[in-house]
Swiss-Prot record:
Gene assigned in the entry: obg
GO MF annotations in UniProt: GTP binding; GTPase activity; magnesium ion binding
Organism for this UniProt entry: Oenococcus oeni (strain ATCC BAA-331 / PSU-1)
UniProt cross-references to SUPFAM superfamilies, sorted A to Z: Obg GTP-binding protein C-terminal domain, Obg GTP-binding protein N-terminal domain, P-loop containing nucleoside triphosphate hydrolases
OBG-type G domain: residues covered: 160-335
Protein name (database record): GTPase Obg
Subunit comment: Monomer.
């Protein structure tokens, strides 16, 4: 089963409930007047970080999320019930972007963090709200405001203290299964790990930390070869790297350990040079095999020849030799490693990196001409058309006045529209009548 760390979903917040037209019909109230209430607010949609989630697998088959609509208003001026908000759960480390522009909206790294992604529409006003001294009994009401619609891209980057890097079959999955309660799939082929696996290490002295066994890296990963981009996205989120190198001759990769070390570092550098600034420990794996000791000596000599001073820990996950020593060394390194990277990422969760453009407030519009028909293109005018109660003449006349105030009539006349031509706004048709 392939790891799902990206998904594109569509979200539709709830529409506001419709306002209603109603009048008082009570004994001893001869001039009862308007009595129609407002509609309730539509449901908002939030993202919320759930610490129990580890992947975006839930979004493979569920890609459409719709909040409920508000209830319509009632008589006696009663406001309709507002709809419940919809909460969409995502794992920590999820980055939300606009799918159409690829602009980042928010980076969710903190458990329990919630973020409002789509606003529900306000309730339409009932006829009580339109009463004036000159029109004390209006037959005007509004439909509910449409809820926001948005297509977003989700991208998960694993959050862990320690990341295991190395070629496939370097022993990362076996190591993780030995030192944590994680149970990754393990096999003797070169793409052992497809899914990032997280495990928690708990030491006898009370210290603990998380380890991520990430998809195996191959040459060309920084250019997207194999699982490269997926792997490197996750590496960005780790504080300490364990560079796992198979010291045996049974990996089947056909390259020496030092060459493997150089290739992995080159891929990390090509993707982001800052990755090589992370604290790193070289882990010599499979030291229980016959050829490993000699290969390790050659490896150390290559490091010395290039004046590379890097800590090395020898382990065998099969015999569990050296694993405790390695974990203590990692814990000590984490204690000394500033948490600047994490703080920077957490700070970004409080900053709105993307500003929603509210086209509904702009009075700009475009006019398109097809034969004797005219089409008005405008976010705000389309919204007003949706909110117009087209069952009453007064509501339609109010909408016509709004169009004139935006200059639509004048622009249509300038463009050549004649009385009786059909004007289409958001699928609804109106006969054009120019008023002097």
């Amino acid at each position: 089963m392939a790891f799902v760390d990206q998904a594109t979903i569509e979200m539709k917040a709830g529409n506001g409930g419709d306002g209603i037209i109603s009048f008082r019909h009570e004994k001893f109230v001869p001039l009862g007047g308007p009595f129609g209430g407002d509609g309730g607010k539509g449901g908002d949609i939030y993202f919320i970080v759930d610490e129990g989630l580890r992947t975006l697998m839930d979004f493979r088959y569920n890609r459409h999320f719709r909040a409920k609509h508000g209830e319509k208003g009632g008589t006696k001026g009663m406001t309709g019930a507002s709809a419940d908000d919809l909460y969409v759960k995502v794992p920590a480390g999820t980055i939300i972007s606009n799918a159409d522009t690829n602009q980042q909206i928010v980076d969710l790294t903190e458990n329990g963090k919630k973020f409002l992604i789509a606003h529900g529409g306000r309730g339409g006003r009932g006829n009580m709200r339109f009463a004036t001294p000159s029109n004390p009994a209006p037959e005007i009401s509004e439909n509910g405001e449409p809820g926001e619609t948005l297509k977003v891209k989700l991208e998960l980057r694993v959050l862990a203290d320690v990341g295991l890097v190395g070629f496939p079959s370097a022993g990362k999955s076996t190591f993780l299964s030995v030192v944590t309660a994680a149970r990754p799939k393990i096999a003797a082929y070169h793409f052992t790990t497809i899914d990032p696996n997280l495990g928690m290490v708990q030491l006898p002295d009370g210290r603990d930390f998380t380890i991520a066994d990430l998809p195996g890296l191959i040459k060309g990963a920084s250019k997207g070869v194999g699982l490269g981009f997926e792997f490197l996205r996750h590496v960005e989120r780790t504080r300490v790297l364990l560079h796992m190198i198979d010291m045996s001759e049974e990996s089947g990769l056909g390259i020496k350990p030092f060459e493997a070390y150089l290739q992995i570092n080159q891929e990390l550098k090509s993707y982001d040079p800052r990755l090589l600034d992370r604290p790193m420990i070289i882990v010599a794996t499979k030291m229980d095999l016959p050829s490993s000791k000699a290969n390790l000596e050659d490896f150390k000599q290559e490091l010395a020849n290039r004046q590379i001073n890097m800590p090395i820990v020898e382990i065998s996950s099969v015999t569990q030799t050296g694993t405790k020593q390695l974990l203590l060394k990692v814990a000590d390194l984490l204690d000394k490693t500033p948490r600047m990277i994490e703080r920077k990422e957490e700070q970004s969760t409080d900053d709105r990196l993307y500003e929603f453009k509210d086209d509904h407030q702009s009075t700009d519009f475009q006019i398109e001409h097809e034969g004797d028909d005219w089409i008005i293109v405008s976010e705000r005018i389309s919204k007003l058309a949706k909110m117009t109660n087209k069952t009453t003449d007064e509501s339609l006349r109010r909408f016509a006045r709004q169009l004139r105030s935006f200059g639509v009539d004048d622009k249509l006349r300038e463009a050549g529209a004649k009385d009786g031509d059909m004007v289409y706004i958001d699928g609804a048709d109106f006969a054009f009548e120019f008023e002097e």
